[in-house]
Amino acid sequence: MVFHIVISDASAGRVYKLDHNAPMSTWAYALNYTPLRVAWAGSEAVVVFYVLSGFVLALPFARSRGPSWRVFYPRRLIRLYVPAIASLIFAWITTLIVHRRIISGGSPWLNHHASEPTGPMQILLGSSLMAGWGGLNTSLWSLRWEVMFSLLLPIFLILAAWCSRWDLGKAVVVLLFCAAWPLVGWFYPDLVYISVFSLGVLMAYNLDALSNAASRIPPFAWGIVVTASIVLLTNSWIVAGVDLNNPARRAWIAIASIGAAGLVWVAIGCRAARRLLSHRSIAWLGGISFSLYLTQEPVVVGLAFVSGGRIPLWLEVPLAFVAAVLVGWIFYRLVERPSHRFARAWGSKRRSAAAGLQQSSAPSRTAVPMPGSEAT
């Protein structure tokens, strides 16, 4: 969310496109080309989310407590698609309220939302969550890979469970693929994103080993782990500050994935991090995070077009943040939470139907015994 607020600003938006040639202050340079970039990371935050999602979805199955697939798939797709489609409708409504127009000298990212189509057809096409949302809600690009991972989850689980002593080698293969594919891949370089989920899956299957390793880390050393993880996560921008055309930047996802896995490990194993993340306000934001993710872009874009992109960034960040959180909370209450209830009810109904079918197909206790069965 902070990422979108920042790049809706004209100057920051040009930095995002890496065509900003004007001199930068020391503070601006630090926020863009040092690990401080993590404060408004965009794609890097998506990588963290993918690792975390792989971990969370795989953990019940790694513990042999996962639901049946006939329950998992409908429930999962309902929880993803219903709020996402509702967010497209919400975004379309915002375009009816706030006119989008090209702003001369404005943010390239913001003007993209004025030049792209934003009609009912984009709601229809975007509802696939594969493409077609135009300028309505471009954040949905990352949900495409979440859907594909959910559909392919059995394959990820089989590969993770197979030959556990090779798990480190599996992780190395994933990272090598993430590094090499953007450099030599002939088909859709963004395909590496779906590979990132596998790191979270491997972490779920090795949770005990990760917890044991975390128990041996002294408290002060966690700061080093966090710092190193952030450096790895923001590697692309650190390199860009030195050499914009360095080919290593194309392999940034592989390096960032290591940092993302490190941050997830900190959340799992560091007591201080667990206390922080379980704080009431942080837990509340986590509860509405999906709704916030789905609605923040239309809110940020709408506010930017209302102001004509003239609000100074120091004021725009808190205003847009508060507005987006408020809208996200309302969306959670009206859309996401009811969709969760519907998904759970659907899953319970499917389990009940399966149990009834299994019971009806079981041999009756009063069945006529087979010849010779009396002796057993």
Give short role names for the model-derived ranges:
Residues P35, F197, V225-P338:
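Alpha-helical transmembrane segments of multi-pass integral membrane proteins
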Residues A58-R65, T94-H99, F156-R165, V201-S211, ...:
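Structural signal for the C-terminal ends of transmembrane alpha-helices
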Residues M1-A62, A84, S289:
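Functionally critical transmembrane alpha-helices in membrane proteins and complexes, commonly lining
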Residues A41-V46, Y50-S53, L57-R100, G106-P117, ...:
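Transmembrane alpha-helical segments and their boundary/interface "anchor" motifs
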Residues Y16-A41, L80-V147, L151, A256-A267:
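Membrane-interface helix-loop-helix regions
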Residues T34, R70-P74, L136-N137, S195, ...:
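Alpha-helical membrane-protein architecture signal
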